[in-house]
């Protein structure tokens, strides 16, 4: 039976290991905090004493690590032990520039590399659900595609440019965190006005706030700031109301939005659509 290696058994990595084990795949794991790796031994994983030992003889290698520096450090440690031709699949969320440079360094060393960050929770990883992005050489992707598809609900191959998956992962997480900040402000305003925050969230069962992504998002991307369906000046008035409704309680997102709106208004954009909150290169169309 082919054996794979997974480096990094935090919450997400452990979920992936459990999914592999449930599918009958033999998995060797290593983690910087050994206890986290040891917890998977009872479920059938083999725990290696070092990352090099984990990847030695493995037919495929997976990384689920916290940051670029750790990824680079582990790669240096495992490089001599990698089986010739094995594909290293990195699921870590990393900087696009760092990912591109990493891919080039590895290519020069003859190491096959694919970046495949994910949008999934630990439970989704264990269940083989969610979305996996992938970018890197077509040949490498084609070779591991079936295995990656078995790990998730959908694999989206973005192309050969090695940093695309890293960038798209940050795009997605940017919206996740921005929405989380807006939700935090809704909770603050609700409490300040004697409304149960759980009840306040019911507005989003009727008002589909996410539609702005598909509506205004493309306009902002193209720099189309006129005609205005929601002018910056009117939106700024509403943001002022939100800040006032919080009754001196600190908000997460709205003060930053207010600052950007003030910049746009000062630059003559009061009558532009709120798509003008995007980069200053925006032009009226």
Model feature map: region roles:
Residues 15, 53, 60, 66, ...:
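Amphipathic alpha-helical hairpins
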Residues 51-112:
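Rossmann-fold NAD(P) dinucleotide-binding segment
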Residues 164-281:
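Helical "substrate-binding/catalytic lid" subdomain
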Residues 27, 47, 113-114, 155, ...:
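Hydrophobic beta-strand scaffold residues
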